[in-house]
Amino acid sequence: MRKSLKQKIVSSLLAVSLAVSLAPIGQAKADSTSEVTQTPSITKQIDPNRAIEHVRFLSETIGPRPGGTKSEEWASRYIGMQLKSMGYEVEYQPFQVPDQYVGFIESPLSTKRNWQAGAAPNALISTEAVTAPLIFVQGGTKLEDIPNEVNGKIVLFERGTTVTDYNKQVENAVSKGAKGVLLYSLIGGRGNYGQTFNPRLMKKQSIPVFGLAYAQGNAFKEEIAKKGTTILSLKARHESKLTSLNVIAKKKPKKSTGNEKAVVVSSHYDSVVGAPGANDNASGTGLVLELARAFQNVETDKEIRFITFGSEETGLLGSDYYVNSLSQKERDRILGVFNADMVATNYDKAKNLYAMTPDGSTNFVTDAALQAGKQLNNDLVLQGKFGSSDHVPFAEAGIPAALFIWMGVDSWNPLIYHIEKVYHTPQDNVLENISPERMRMALDVIGTGVYNSLQKPVPQTEQKAA
């Protein structure tokens, strides 16, 4: 870890630790079943305000956390130091991840849109700024769409609908003397607003070409409409030979033999380029850290692990690496994995907290979640079928696991679902996308499910497998 990064972590931790220590303790919810009434409910120890302070630090103080970058490393060290301060044994598990091509835009506009974008790998990648006025051009797939005024300017386009279309936009702008090209997405792949992307160019270009999110492009378009133009500076960086980290905290039973069953609470802490990732997935990481604090003094006869994975957004790389590092004996020790991803959105159509498995089957974790919902008199907890998160590698290895996510589902076949429109965008921030009430509910449900799992006897089938 570089010295400058370490200084940032230490100074920032002092500030956030003070804020967290002053947060009030949340009120407990009454148990509605008799299964655990003999012991205090873990919800008495849970405070969503603490979790949201972690969300705020990760998404605002650090910001976008693409896999393998310095910002992701900063986040991993922050998480590790928080867990160590609670008394946990902490391991950093490194693994290699693909290169990142990141564009940076200096703009007179507010920084709330996170002026970070995807850079085209085979366009100009340079830390020396390309500075020029910005001009918006409608269309651009035909040469006649491009006015002569683009000469010496940075051109903003609404991204063409296909790779071929946006390559034509770039090539036509270059032929008219453009100094840079910004392509902004209109829509994402899941009904969300357009997100940043790395343009795939068919020809090498000697100017910077960036892929912007809808919010960024629209903000620039509005600025041009108001003022006629604005001056931008473009820089880009190719980050190679990258290492990402899984942060693993363990709490062994008081009488440990090394063969006890284990319950895992997990999340990923990285985000996509250009997105502060408050809900996706600083929310899950804030939940993991708050549950780690709540469970630090809970005695059980099972091991509990709190794991935050790196580089989920680049293909579940962290969780896949972790699962592959386990022997079959170690895999058999895991009773279940409670994976939190996008657990605090305020989006009204994401109306249920789901416990999802990749194939839709029930397992130890979904059963625990549904039981917790009943115990808490919460009828918003449902079970369903969904992949696309860190529960998948565990499930593929035969380990019971479930994804916890706020979502609205209109139909399972065909699958028609709702997640927040600001998913994977610069608008995924605390102010615009985080609900303390939703965070509270996720903490209560997952916390209660984990608590019950740690207290109850190991199922007979699991005892035989051990």
Predicted region positions:
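Sec-dependent signal peptide cleavage junction
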Residues: 20-35
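N-terminal capping segment at the start of a domain
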Residues: 33-71, 86, 93-95, 196, ...
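Second-shell loop/turn segments in exported
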Residues: 37-47, 60-73, 89, 121-125, ...
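Noncatalytic luminal/extracellular "stalk/propeptide" segments of secretory-pathway proteins
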Residues: 44-49, 53-154, 161
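Alpha-helical metal-binding/catalytic segments enriched in His/Glu/Asp
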Residues: 83, 173, 187, 247, ...
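Soluble metallo-hydrolase cores and metallopeptidase-like ectodomains found primarily
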Residues: 117-144, 198-278, 293, 297, ...
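Metal-dependent peptidase/peptidase-like ectodomains
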Residues: 300, 309-408, 412-413
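His/Asp/Glu-rich mid-to-C-terminal helical/loop segments that flank catalytic regions of hydrolases
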Residues: 413-466
